[in-house]
């Protein structure tokens, strides 16, 4: 399984700005992402605490695909391109995207 992980920093503007970001993320962005070909599941989590560290991360989304080829096809799709444009509008400079590959060989 290949995962596209999106980490979101707290927007400037306090709790009102965060509430507006979350409203638009849920109402605009996630419906666009849902139309991505090959997307198996999406999980969204709020960051409640960073143990032993400071963080400005407020939201993390995991989008799972069968493999890297499925992710690449999804990224090239019209749905994901539209989601990317929307993300640049609602969260400019606030997102970091990571591609994660299973590492089961590291587990005992």
Predicted regions: what is each one?
Residues 1-108:
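Macromolecular interaction modules
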């Amino acid at each position: 399984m290949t995962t596209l992980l999106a980490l979101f920093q707290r927007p400037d503007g306090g709790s009102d700005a965060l509430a507006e970001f979350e409203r638009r993320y849920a109402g605009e962005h996630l419906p666009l992402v849902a139309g991505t070909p090959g997307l198996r599941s999406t999980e969204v989590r709020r960051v409640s605490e960073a143990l032993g560290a400071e963080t400005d991360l407020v939201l993390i989304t995991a989008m799972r695909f069968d493999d890297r080829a499925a992710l690449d096809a999804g990224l090239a799709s019209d749905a994901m391109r539209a989601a990317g444009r929307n993300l640049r509008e609602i969260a400019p400079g606030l997102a970091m995207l990571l591609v994660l590959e299973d590492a089961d060989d590291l587990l005992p």
